[in-house]
Amino acid sequence: MKELVLKYGCNPNQKPAKIYMENGSELPIKVLCGNPGYINLLDALNGWQLVSELKKVSNLPAATSFKHVSPAGAAIGLELDEVLKKIYWVDDLTLSPLASAYARARGADRMSSFGDFIALSDICDKETALLIKREVSDGVIAPGFCDEALEILKAKKNGKYNIIQIDENYTPDDIEKKQVFGITFEQGHNNLDINKSLLENIVTKNKNLPEDKKLDLLISLIILKYTQSNSVCYVKDGQAIGIGAGQQSRIHCTRLAGNKADNWFLRQAKCVLDLPFKDGIKRADRDNAIDVYIGDNSVEELLSDGMWEHLFTKRPSEFTREEKKEWLKNLSGVCLGSDAFFPFSDNIERAKRSGVEYIAQPGGSLRDDAVIECCDKYNMTMAFTGIRLFHH
């Protein structure tokens, strides 16, 4: 297949639309089912690059959950504990390493992952297909699909689920192009190899950087490489727990991603795990209710008479601000990556509140000394990578 004609571009009025290889060669993808759209394909191709790099750095299967050309989550295939299985709604499933990777990628920020495009580093197995089957998703890209997985996925969305197979040996040209307003932009493909050498320049007094934290920092940097800038990523135990994408202020990235990380951890509190949902309440409705319950804005409405009865068998007790603050003190060992330098130490102060102990960022700010001093105040370990990771 040398070109794929699309229904339309970013929006329905943007016609005609297609993808093709500029040199006239075959596309490195095959559409096995469905009719993927312009944004679906942007998500698929960015997501595939991300999971390929995660697998390379970890030697484990990897998955990502993409929405609007940024990852909502990404992870490697580490086994889940019972609490994570419960908050990800997978405690009733048998999980392969690849399925565990997607459960983590989808589960960290389920509100953002609703209607995602999935990328898998490995051949999709039956266990992963069964997990995908029951989630609201636009499609999946992988290097292959076992027969059972393909049969399961082809039945999704009444046979219209987007399934894309990519040639895992494909490599792009060194030079890439795109057009904006009729003007062609040309640049070298971002083939930066993210590896442990980027973490050697530790600038804080605390030089301790365990191997598992090095891996988490590398995961954060790979995620940032394929996230719309400005971006910041919090990672713990092989998975993103908070991604702040596409913000024009660094501190807003750090706050947004930190708030997502906080929500991930708040969902693990006993009062949230024990919420008395009625039988038959769908996962998406549970996700929405939990998001409100752990938030500060609309919880009174959720728990008001005439409202809680729609979701719960009995009225839950409020999760107070003081209780949430106390619970969040238990979050620790978090790694943080930033796609550009921190201009002010307020980013470090905010990161500390979400359990961050290890940081990787380019460095190069006029206020690097103040940022390092703030890290030293909290005994954090910070590496200057010297590499910016903007993505647009």
Predicted feature residues:
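C-terminal binding/interaction regions
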Residues: 116, 120-121, 134-164, 169-171, ...
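Flexible, glycine/charged-enriched surface loops at secondary-structure junctions
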Residues: 57-65, 164-166, 229-236, 266-277, ...
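Conserved helix-loop functional segments at active or binding sites
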Residues: 53, 226, 263-267, 353, ...
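Active-site loops and adjacent core secondary-structure elements that bind or stabilize anionic groups
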Residues: 1-198, 213-231
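Gly-rich Lys/Arg/Thr-decorated short loops/hinges at beta-loop-alpha junctions or inter-strand turns
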Residues: 23-35, 108-114, 190-207, 285-307, ...
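Active-site-proximal loop/turn and secondary-structure-junction residues that shape catalytic pockets
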Residues: 70, 124, 236-239, 247, ...
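Glycine- and Gly-Pro-enriched alpha-helical subdomains that act as flexible
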Residues: 72-110, 241-341
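Substrate-contacting helices/loops that form the catalytic groove of nucleic-acid
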Residues: 174-209, 267-288, 299
